[in-house]
């Protein structure tokens, strides 16, 4: 099995950041800040795991690799935008969150296309 080392490393970094943000949210954040950080951290963690799966996907093609990069990047952009709103009160950064969301949606759609194009193999 081949592994995309760079994608796996980026996914791992995203996972670590998601845990850090979740820990910060759990310890000492007010209710509104906690909600924003928890939401961002959740999406970042889910998409870090998806990116890691894409990095180690057996027989992965370009669509799966692209899905991994879009997933990790989208999760990071979404989470950082919500964190900037919550922690720095940069409300204008809230406008960037949908870009991250769009990247995450694109990642899932690329995986859908990859799955539909794949050949079935007997178990």
Kindly give the residue locations of the regions a language model identified:
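Polytopic transmembrane helical bundles with strong interfacial aromatic enrichment
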Residues: 1-123
């Amino acid at each position: 099995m081949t592994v995309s080392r760079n994608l796996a490393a980026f996914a791992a970094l995203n996972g670590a950041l998601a845990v850090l943000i979740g820990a910060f949210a759990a310890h000492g954040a007010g209710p509104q800040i906690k909600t924003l950080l928890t939401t961002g951290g959740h999406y970042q963690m889910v998409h870090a795991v998806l990116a890691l799966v894409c990095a180690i996907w057996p027989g992965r093609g370009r669509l799966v690799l692209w899905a991994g990069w879009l997933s990790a990047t989208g999760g990071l952009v979404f989470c950082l935008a919500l964190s900037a709103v919550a922690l720095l009160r940069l409300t204008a950064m809230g406008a960037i969150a949908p870009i991250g969301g769009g990247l995450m949606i694109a990642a899932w759609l690329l995986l859908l296309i990859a799955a539909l194009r794949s050949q079935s193999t007997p178990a």
